[in-house]
Amino acid sequence: MSKKHKIKPAVAVNNRTADPYITLGAGRVESDAFWRWGDDNLFPNALALMARRSVTHRRIINDKADYISGKGFTCDEAQQPRLAAFLRHVNGDGESLRQVLNKLAFDKALFGNAFLEAVTDAGHTFLSLHHQDASRCRLARDSAHVLLHHDWTAFKAAEARTLPLYPAFEEQSDGTLRAVIHYKDYEPTFEHYGVPPY
């Protein structure tokens, strides 16, 4: 009878720095336009990659977002028909308030930050709420605006959208007034961004 030896694979990581988070891009990014989110400004990308590589980690993040958003929001439709209609469709994409809240809760659980864009007009005749992907948001150096960019590995100021932080609203080229609400928990020494809760 021969005995088979099972070989168990092992993974070793050589950490080049005292910081346990892996730097994905250049060692350090300097800019006078925005506050870096991590040394290479790609910390959200590293967190998203970590969640994609661990089924358990991702499941916990998804479950947390689902628990927070629950089954959605309800109200007495007979008493408040406009509120009920708003809860069903909070933006032009047809998303419900629950869907937007679920995305915000996911970002907050994964990144420690979430960004909600509020849209209205000068007469406040409507309100539209849009989730903004936290991995695409950075705080401007004036700490009063948020920069939205599609690819922070190749940032070009001309391609970035700039929106004010709530409660300030600024008129945009389409005539709407917009602001971004930045959700984060207080963390000592982290003035601009929140820290993931894990």
Predicted regions and their residues:
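Structured, contiguous alpha/beta core segments that scaffold functional sites
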Residues: 2-56, 60-198
